[in-house]
Amino acid sequence: MIADKKNKCPGCKRTDCGGCGIYRKLNTNKQVRIQFPPDFRAEPAQGLGISFDVGTTTLAGMLWDLGNASLLDAETGTNPQAVFGTDVISRLQAAAKEENREKMRKMLTDKLDEMAFQMVKPFIRTGREEEEKATWTDIKKVVIVGNTAMCEILLGIKPEGLLKAPFTPDYKQIRQRKGKSFGFSFLQNADIIVLPPIGGYVGADALAVYHYVNSCEKGKILAVDI
């Protein structure tokens, strides 16, 4: 939508729409600056890491050895929030209600906990109980991406901005804290990093692709999101 002298923006009441973004000129360039944590680098580290892609329908996880960047295992699962609706809009409308939001968030953290355990299970040391528990702390870092709606639900955010134009996310920077404060159990000791969206419904999954492509050798690269 383009604002003109006869058509003021209903959001900021201006014809040049310098504020809310509902109306924008066609030649308007939009830049987003996202600050990554200092340790968010492709450098060797001790322990295990997990990456999750949280989709509306499907959840995907990968277990990594942070020491040599080798893939150890992978796991997929169905997003249990489907009982609240199978499409993004239905899910957001459900999450906008206070009585649903915490249930939906816990459904997701419980499922990701379960997937993490299934991936780590083959590598758990056998023997005394305390030795088995020690492997839980081997999971040092968990990076979570996904579409904007699923990430906001995971963070327990009331997704008001995504339900109306100009579809502005309610979080715009990386969220990082211990798993316990996110509500995780198996992953309670890990550093959880939730990447932010690029903007609107262009989510953290797209940002992850960009971050990876940016680290590749120079050349033409085609990224396809189906």
State what each model feature region is:
Residues T58-A60:
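Short loop/turn microsegments at loop-to-beta-strand junctions
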Residues I226:
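Segments forming glycine/polar-rich beta-alpha architectures that bind adenosine-containing cofactors
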Residues M1-S51, T56, N68, M104-G127, ...:
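Nucleotide/phosphate-binding catalytic cleft detector across ATP-hydrolyzing
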Residues L63-E102:
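Short glycine-rich, Thr/Ser-proximal phosphate-binding strand/loop in the N-terminal lobe
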